[in-house]
Amino acid sequence: MKQQATFSMLAKTFKGLEEVLAQELITLGANEVQLERRAVSFRGDKALLYRANLCLRTALRILVPIASFKAKDTDALYNQLRKINWSAYMQSSTTFAIDATVYSETFRNSRFVTYRVKDAIADYWMEKENQRPSVSTREPDLLINIHIGNEQVTVSLDSSGESLHKRGYRVATTEAPISEVLAAGMLLMAGWNGQSDLYDPMCGSGTFLIEAALIARNIAPGVFRSAYAFEKWPDFDADLWSNIYNDDSHERDFTHKIYGSDASFYAIQQAAKNIKAAGVQKDIELKQIRMEEIKWSNDAINGQMVNALVMLNPPYGERLHSNKEMEDLYSAIGSTLKHQFAGSTAWIISSNAAAMKCIGLKPSKKYHLLNGELDCQFNKYDLFAGKRNESIIHSGF
């Protein structure tokens, strides 16, 4: 078999997930893996590009850099862009779109940068074939990414298209659902690999539950997506992609159970729809119940000890909740964890630092993550088994 050429790539992610993403890439077989700002750079071949899009749980998109240069102004930017051999990546009939990210005192207007990039590409093709390619913001054949830091410009091709957090299984939603990429990253940070039961007592539309099931069974998160941008590239290898997409040899059995509950019946309905769309119904049980009403025991169930991993993304109080409501809610969370989940481990994310103190448990680990634009604490709590009320029974599910 002919060995494929290798090239540089960049996987974008959320702040705080860089190390998790780097480990994912190493596991996939990537070389020259290096942490960047909200990204990880690496090197690999076309097969790795396809696998990265399909298999990475904590990547938002995979970029392939094609040019890097310095530009002091928009004229210099235009001239450098004209020098790129665009015919290697597109034709004059190719529709394209531009995504520009600018951190620069020189280039303050990202929209004007986008116009200059468009002009440079259009003028390249006018000179070459007397034909201008069309810009299309909806389903373009080629998505071009421009990153400018001060005067350093990097031009990349976006191999993903829609953000990779859009797995394809979310058919229903609730208010402010957590990103699939962030949920998967948090699960991996918590050490989840399907080794125990897992419980999300505020499951919303089921993101933690589904991502946990996919990790437990080692199902690639991208199998539900209908399309990737690289499928429209001139050098797309349909046979290679088909082999990678249809390879389920790394999937595994999952012998434990994933539980989700929520105070809202509507949320449980929405979660059930998403779980069905992801095809993981047999791994997940749902129940409508308030946090403070939950009963859980570490007694043997079906001959197995239940030492659950508990994942919680409670309300942060950003939407009209009073401080008293938040304090009471987080206090109830702490009480339930302490009395119902002794012997288990809980991880909680929240941007409400004051409310987090009301949990009343000392975190054994603390991380900082971004949930959207909100700076959040992501804390681990070891729920040590101590004296418990003998009346506690496993009645939660």
Task: Tell me what each language-model feature is.
Residues K2-P140, G396-F397:
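Non-catalytic nucleic-acid substrate-recognition regions in nucleic-acid-modifying enzymes
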Residues Y103-T106, S163, P315-R319:
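A short, flexible beta-alpha/helix-coil linker loop
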Residues I178-W296, E325:
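Conserved S-adenosyl-L-methionine
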Residues I144-S160, N379:
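C-terminal edge-of-domain segments
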Residues V155-M189:
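SAM-dependent Rossmann-like transferase core, predominantly class I methyltransferases
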Residues R51, L56, E162-R167, V171-A172, ...:
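Flexible, glycine-/basic-rich loop-and-beta segments that form/coincide
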Residues I289-F397:
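C-terminal catalytic and target-recognition region of SAM-dependent MTase-like enzymes
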